Amino acid sequence: MSYQENNAMPSIMDALVPMVVEQTSRGERSYDIYSRLLKERVIFLTGQVEDHMANLVVAQLLFLESENPDKDIFLYINSPGGSVTAGMSIYDTMQFIKPNVSTVCMGQACSMGAFLLAGGAPGKRYVLPNSRVMIHQPLGGFQGQASDIQIHAQEILTIKKKLNTLLAEHTGQPLEVIEKDTDRDNFMAADDAVKYGLVDAVLNKRD
């Protein structure tokens, strides 16, 4: 993954973020669409899971908890996955804060995205009908001295065991089934993700 320097020109997507204008007693106030939805306790987790994105999601979760610790937070996920450590910082915060975090998959939730989807509050994990969910084992590649490669290989096995154990808890599947099903890329349609226990229901239309 490549990163742009801080002084790089903004991307087209950055330039095209819609703005919402509201009338208040003090006049007009404008928000970008994501900030406006944050007021409604909606957080978007989109794209690669990496440290910068994880920090933003964690900050929003903590902010919404401070605003109202008893009201649900809605986390919309459209992600191909990414860094395990970045994803675990989001996961641990979801479990730590007092509000229930309802997760919704739109588009795709793969790898760490699927793990975070399953980590939502029980009974409040959803998938849109044409979304795809994919689980697999952690990926890694290392270079260097043989002893260092051995250390990193052991770390990957430790992470794999931890992720599989947590996924078994969230899905209700036996650990042996999780280990077998995550050995290779395992794609699921919306209904299959419900049957597997990664989510609780398919959302076709808002009530």
Curated annotation (Swiss-Prot):
InterPro entries per the UniProt record, alphabetical: ClpP, ClpP/crotonase-like_dom_sf, ClpP/TepA, ClpP_His_AS, ClpP_Ser_AS
Localization terms from the record: Cytoplasm
Disulfide bonds listed in the record: none
Any one of the GO BP annotations: protein quality control for misfolded or incompletely synthesized proteins
CDD domains recorded: S14_ClpP_2
One Gene Ontology CC term in the entry: cytoplasm
Role noted for this protein: Cleaves peptides in various proteins in a process that requires ATP hydrolysis. Has a chymotrypsin-like activity. Plays a major role in the degradation of misfolded proteins.
Subunit field text: Fourteen ClpP subunits assemble into 2 heptameric rings which stack back to back to give a disk-like structure with a central cavity, resembling the structure of eukaryotic proteasomes.
Entry protein name: ATP-dependent Clp protease proteolytic subunit
Source organism (scientific name): Aliivibrio salmonicida (strain LFI1238) (Vibrio salmonicida (strain LFI1238))
